[in-house]
Amino acid sequence: MEHAFTPLEPLLPTGNLKYCLVVLNQPLDARFRHLWKKALLRACADGGANHLYDLTEGERESFLPEFVSGDFDSIRPEVKEYYTKKGCDLISTPDQDHTDFTKCLQVLQRKIEEKELQVDVIVTLGGLGGRFDQIMASVNTLFQATHITPVPIIIIQKDSLIYLLQPGKHRLHVDTGMEGSWCGLIPVGQPCNQVTTTGLKWNLTNDVLGFGTLVSTSNTYDGSGLVTVETDHPLLWTMAIKS
């Protein structure tokens, strides 16, 4: 069975996907307000609350997350105090074997189940800038998330989006008008031994993708508005978002 998905649909004013929003500990950009407004449930992972607090000065009561989770080594004391006073759920997750992002997803999935929400995707803001080790930790969380939630997860920061394709066939609709010029398929963790695509300028036909051999970066679209990908192992899809 093919999995059909429009990665940039949450950014569209007319988008119909039902999503939850996770704010990580990195600067927020202009897309934040639109995504916040339409989210079914909103959460901050530890220091993500600092960025939310700073960005919404003068209107903070309109931007209260359902919960803030983490080991609370990054959230500033005044930020923690503010959201506590406003009735937000502050959930301590001290486990050092997992990142605050991973632990936030665990809490989020429990909330989704408790509220019996129908969720199409989890949109995450941040996680793709700054320190390289933290970027790779974000990618690792996408792999871990398959054991946490059945809901697909996208990570967005500035002009980049990543989404982990599971083994099988995928139809990615790239006709929203918000797509930038580049895209890529990156075999993180292990080689993908059979990858076939359509809709790209440089397509693959039963090709092996792997570090040390071939990695499909700086690819682009053929103009059809649809990309299909078939892979035998998890494969990271990345794409540009128009500024």
UniProtKB/Swiss-Prot annotation:
Recorded family membership: Belongs to the thiamine pyrophosphokinase family.
Annotated function: Catalyzes the phosphorylation of thiamine to thiamine pyrophosphate (TPP) utilizing UTP and therefore links the biosynthesis of TPP to pyrimidines metabolism. By producing thiamine pyrophosphate, a cofactor of the mitochondrial pyruvate dehydrogenase indirectly regulates pyruvate oxidation and lipogenesis. Although it can also catalyze thiamine phosphorylation using ATP and CTP in vitro, it does so with significantly lower efficiency and without physiological relevance evidence.
Catalytic reactions of this protein: thiamine + UTP = thiamine diphosphate + UMP + H(+)
GO BP of this protein: regulation of acetyl-CoA biosynthetic process from pyruvate; thiamine diphosphate biosynthetic process; thiamine metabolic process
Subunit structure: Homodimer.
Species whose genome carries this gene: Mus musculus (Mouse)
Protein name as it appears in the record: Thiamine pyrophosphokinase 1
Coiled-coil positions: none
Pathways involved: Cofactor biosynthesis; thiamine diphosphate biosynthesis; thiamine diphosphate from thiamine: step 1/1
UniProt cross-references to SUPFAM superfamilies, sorted A to Z: Thiamin pyrophosphokinase, catalytic domain (SSF63999), Thiamin pyrophosphokinase, substrate-binding domain (SSF63862)
GO CC term, one of those recorded: cytosol
CDD domains documented for this protein: TPK (cd07995)
InterPro entries xrefs: Thi_PPkinase, Thiamin_pyrophosphokinase_euk, Thiamin_PyroPKinase_B1-bd, TPK_B1-bd_sf, TPK_catalytic, TPK_catalytic_sf
EC number: 2.7.6.-
Gene3D superfamilies cross-referenced by the UniProt entry: Thiamin pyrophosphokinase, catalytic domain (3.40.50.10240), Thiamin pyrophosphokinase, thiamin-binding domain (2.60.120.320)
Gene: Tpk1
Keywords tagged on the record: ATP-binding, Kinase, Nucleotide-binding, Transferase
Keyword Transferase: yes
MF-aspect GO terms: ATP binding; identical protein binding; kinase activity; thiamine binding; thiamine diphosphokinase activity; UTP thiamine diphosphokinase activity
Tissue specificity of this protein: Detected in kidney and liver, and at lower levels in heart, brain and testis.
